[in-house]
Amino acid sequence: MESLRIYNTLARDKQVFVPRQPGEVRMYVCGITVYDYCHVGHARMLVVFDLVQRWLRAIGYRVTYVRNITDIDDKIIRRAVENGETIKSLTDRFIGAMHEDETALGIQRPDVEPRATQFIPQMLGMIETLETNGYAYQAADGDVNYSVRKFADYGKLSGKSLDDLRAGERVAANDAKQDPLDFVLWKRAKEDEPEGASWASKYGMGRPGWHIECSAMGCSLLGNHFDIHGGGQDLQFPHHENEIAQSEGATGETFVNYWMHNGFVQVDNEKMSKSLGNFFTIREVLERYDAEVVRFFIVRTHYRSPLNYSDVHLDDARASLTRLYTALKDVEPDTLALDWNEPHGQRFAAAMNDDFNTPVAVATLFELAGEVNRTRDASLARQLKQLAGLLGLLGREPRAFLQQASGAAQAGGLAADEIEAQIAARVAAKQAKDYAEADRIRAELLEAGIALEDKPGGSTEWRRV
C-alpha cells in the first residue's frame, strides 16, 4: 500500500505523513460553538474529520482524536441572556442536539471531547507563561493581549505579512492594545454579565479569548507538539495562526506538523454562513433527506474543494446512493476479511492515501457496483460493503434503505402499508387477467415514486425512486 500523503496548509503542498511516534497519531480538530443548532457547514467539518480518523485507523494507526466544544463565548452569553436561561443550560441543550445530529450522520465520537470551561486553569497557566516569556501584556482596560509583533513567525500558516495586515481584517481595533493586530487572551469581565460568564484570575475576573482555548486544550491533551490539527478553511486565519503564536510562544516547541482545512459549503457560489442568512441547519435538511444521503453528498466531494449545496445535488446524491444499495439488494456478501491486494481495494486505498481523495474512492465503489450487477458475485458484494463501510456508507440492509421514505416523502408520500395494499390489488387484478388495471396500478405507484419489480415465483418487491 502506498504511503499516506496529506495536503499540509503550512507547507502549501502534499506531504508524506510521518507521525511523531511510529504507529500513533494525535489529532486535534476545532469543534463547534454551541449556541444554536448545527448547520450544513458544521456537518461538513464533522464528516470530513470523521473520514480522516476512520481511514487512519483502517490503515493501522492508533489514533487519539480530540475535538473540542466551545462552551463560553460572547455569542453564547448573548443568546443565554436573550433566552432568559443560564449559560450551562443553553450549552448543554445544544451539545445534546449536536450529538443527535452526529449520530444521525454516522459520525463516530472523538476519543476526547473537551469543553473549554473544563480547562480554565490550563488556559490561565499558558497566559501566565506567555506573559513571562514577553508575549503577553495586560492592557489599561484589564484585558490580557498577545503582542503579535513579538512572535517572529506570525503569518507562516496563512501567508499573511504583518505589514500587510490592517486593523479590521477579522480583528477589532481597540485603543487599549499596543498594536491593533494584537489579540485578546483573557477578557476582563463586564459588570452586567450573567453568572457563569467569568472566572477569578490574577488579572481579575474574566474569561478566556477564543484562541487560547484551543491552544491550552490541544497541548494539555496531546502534548506541546502533535501530528495533525484540523478545522474549517475559515479558521486558518486568524484562529489557527493565533494558536501557533500562542502555543509556540509558550512552549518554545513546534506546535503541529500537519494542518488540514476543509473547504466551504456554498449556496449560489457564496459561502454558507449565519451572517449571510443563507444557511440550513442539519435538522432542516434531515426533514427532507435521509441522513446517509446527506453524508454521501458530503463524502463524494474532495474535502478541500467547495461543496455546492442545493436540492439538485442532494437529489443526485440520493439517486447515486440508491444505485449502490440496489447493487447489493439480491446478493448475500461473503464473510471474508478485506484484502487490500484485490484490485478494487488497491485503487480505493491509493485514492484515500492521496490526501483522502474521496471522489476517486467513491468512483471505485461504483465500479464495484457495476460488476456486482453483472456477476452477482458474493465476493465483490463483500468488497463493496467493506470499502463503503470505511466511508461510513452502505451499513444498512439494502431493502431497508430502498423502501425508506425521505423526509419529504414521509410528509406527503405513500406509507409502506398503503404501497403493500396497492401491490395486493395489482396481484388480484393480474389473477383476474385484468392486465390493464394491473398496469394502471404500476403506473400510479411509479408516479408516486414507487418502482415495482416482479420476482420469479410471483412475488413483487418495491423501492422508492
From Swiss-Prot:
SUPFAM superfamilies (alphabetical): Anticodon-binding domain of a subclass of class I aminoacyl-tRNA synthetases, Nucleotidylyl transferase
Positions bound to Zn(2+): 30, 214, 239, 243
GO molecular function: ATP binding; cysteine-tRNA ligase activity; zinc ion binding
Motif 'HIGH' region boundaries: 32-42
Record key words, sorted: Aminoacyl-tRNA synthetase, ATP-binding, Cytoplasm, Ligase, Metal-binding, Nucleotide-binding, Protein biosynthesis, Zinc
Cofactor(s) for this UniProt protein: Zn(2+)
Short sequence motif named 'KMSKS' region, residue ranges: 271-275
GO CC annotations on file: cytosol
Subcellular location: Cytoplasm
Cross-referenced InterPro entries: Cys-tRNA-ligase, Cys-tRNA-synt_Ia_DALR, Cys-tRNA/MSH_ligase, CysS_C, Rossmann-like_a/b/a_fold, tRNA-synt_1_cat_dom, tRNAsynth_Ia_anticodon-bd
EC number: 6.1.1.16
Membrane-crossing residue ranges in chain numbering: none
Name of the top EC class for this enzyme: ligase
Superkingdom of source: Bacteria
Cofactor remark: Binds 1 zinc ion per subunit.
Record field: catalytic activity: tRNA(Cys) + L-cysteine + ATP = L-cysteinyl-tRNA(Cys) + AMP + diphosphate
Residues involved in ATP binding: 274
GO BP terms: cysteinyl-tRNA aminoacylation
Subunit and interaction comment: Monomer.
Similarity comment text for this entry: Belongs to the class-I aminoacyl-tRNA synthetase family.
PANTHER family in UniProt: CYSTEINE--TRNA LIGASE, CYTOPLASMIC, CYSTEINYL-TRNA SYNTHETASE
Protein name (record): Cysteine--tRNA ligase
Gene name of this polypeptide: cysS
